[in-house]
Amino acid sequence: MIPRSGWVLLAGLGACGGSTPAPHAAPTPVSRVAETASAAEVDKVWEQATKAVRRGKWGDVIKHLDRALLEFPPGDPRVTQAHMWEGEAQFALGNNLQAAREFRKASDDTPNDPLAPEALLRVADAYADLWRRPELDPSYGQTALATYQELLNRYPGTTAAKRAQMRIDDLQERFAYKEYKAALYYMRLKAYDSAILYLKDLVATYPRSAVAPDALIRLVQAYRTLGYKEDVQETCGYIRRFHSTAPGVGKACPKGAETS
């Protein structure tokens, strides 16, 4: 069973010292440890977290990092890495929203840290992973797209930005496919005017998408069904100019038949 958050593990960690906790003050042992931990104790917790990361023991990673983050002194350089690792642990366990929060802390609390661009990339990745089926509500996909674009603006030229651009291209393909599926739905209902709206928006917004040529062909079919001869002629001219080798072009737009 995937745990809902690392805080449950943190509560268990606070009670692992061997003594019985006070019945009405469960958080207190953790707070006292955070206030009295020596540098050596903090280093030990960090070492435990590091080993857990290497072994892929994500529950242990969260447990040790939650404690370490409480005990780190202000300005400790390990804080950003701790949030990154906790984000990866939460992501691995399927807790995408918690992962996004941890990655966001790493990118926003220490924006000049070398890990900040990668952290922002992972924020977007966590949201993108929640939008796995294009036909579903695209809210998470839109959040992912906005975050990838934020990365391009904040950290242009970085390796993370280059990877973000690739992910943007993939998301745009998925958005285009979503529009295409909606258009086909209206085509099946013979609601051609509605289908045309989706197809035109797809072609205008995602002209380089893989489904754009087929969307244009479907647009011609809808125009022809409705008797929009000028639109057929104009769209066929566009198809021949930019997608002349796409499958189905010859059948959809035979030369000399645009106005038939």
Enumerate the language-model features and the residues they cover.
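Acidic, polar-rich low-complexity tracts and alpha-helical solenoid repeat scaffolds
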Residues: 2, 16-260
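Sec-dependent bacterial lipoprotein signal peptides
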Residues: 1-14
